[in-house]
Amino acid sequence: MLAMLLAFCLCEVSGPLRAQTHGGRTRAPGLASQNLIALQKKADEARDAGRLDEATKLYHRALAINPKWVEGWWSLGTLQYDSDRYAEAELAFEKVVALNPKHGTARAMLGLCEFELGQPDRALKDIQESEKLGVLEDQQLRDVVMYHEGVLLQRAGRFEAAKAALSSLCLGGLRSGELAGTFGMVALRMRDVAPPSSSTEAGRVVQHVGRAACLSGAKEYDAAKTEFERVIAGTPHFPLLHYAYGRMLQDARDHDGAIKEFEAEIAEQPSNVLPRLRIAAAEYKWNPESGLKFAEDAVKLQPELPLGHYLLGLLLLETGAYQRAIPELETARKAFPQETKIDISLANAYSQVGRPQDAARARAEFARKKQVERASGEEAVEITDAMDARSKQ
């Protein structure tokens, strides 16, 4: 579905693209030749008439004469992408980006080519860079790019970021089996390239969970809750199903319901730290004494996990165990050197145990990092996202 959608929207953006290329015929050097202008016009006419093979040959001829014709490289790239000639399309979009580095739409298309060519790291980097630069005001193209970003993040195990990307699609009204399959894998923390077959129990669970997650992403929480409860009634022991439901209930601001589901996941998987970390994080402000046990258990189960030490340090600090909090927070700071909350928490703990010089250094470090954040215009990544790719399933 999304592949067909992309083919459609690429045809639609060829007009507004001229505003982004800044490479029209009158601007490019060496275009005084009337023959070259005529050749470029013929290439565009063949493209618009659907004579794609002819258009491709004409674009190649024109670009051999004028290799700085940005719009020509774009048109050639889209033709080759639509023909599933991704390696050639990649080269064309690389030319566009080289000639106009701020061309966000071409950067997005380059990322889509890299996705098809099995270059996930490069694809994700270019797609995310395209979002910073800006993609043309074409919602269909934006949806395709956002979906592929979600897939790449899911396969990389960056489930929280993938959830945010896919939720934006659901909030915009997009629904499909393809989207549900990917979102189901995100919610159940599966890094598989494709969801299980729909003829299997696992495949059906993934689809149901994906639909529920999409409803939650669209803020239709009652409908999402109904979908989750239906699938849990049928397969209550499916791995991370209760965890996924707990995350949905957190989004719906149902604190008690979320804790109940995380505890149910612990009962199903006693050695899994994820639900313990979620409870510890959720109880930090609500009931730190209750959350403390779950953070302690998480650290015992997986002592190499820095996030466990971070949450344990915060909960110890909140419950007045300042001396015990310090080594936990210091361990976390080594793993998350840019996280300002660790510095201010350590400053508090140092002050409470009579270490004013250490407290002053921690506050100074906090101020320095905040100044860097303001200068860059970017804040540090939310630390609870460190659950992704840092905890054993």
Where on the chain are the PLM-derived regions?
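Helix-start (N-cap) detector for alpha-helical repeat units in TPR-like alpha-solenoids
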Residues: L36, V70-E71, G104-T105, D138-Q139, ...
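Structural marker of alpha-solenoid helical repeat scaffolds
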Residues: I65, L99, L133-E137, G172, ...
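TPR/TPR-like (Sel1-like) alpha-helical repeat modules
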Residues: F115, Q128-K132, Y147-Q154, F159-G177, ...
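Terminal, low-structured helical/coil segments at or just beyond the last alpha-helical repeat
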Residues: H22-R27, R175-C214, S351-Q393
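Structural signature of tandem alpha-helical TPR/SEL1-like repeats
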Residues: D48-L58, D82-K95, L117-E129, R142, ...
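Alpha-helical segment of the N-proximal tetratricopeptide repeat
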Residues: Q34-I65, D82, R204-T226, R230
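Canonical tetratricopeptide repeat
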Residues: S75, M109, V144, H148, ...
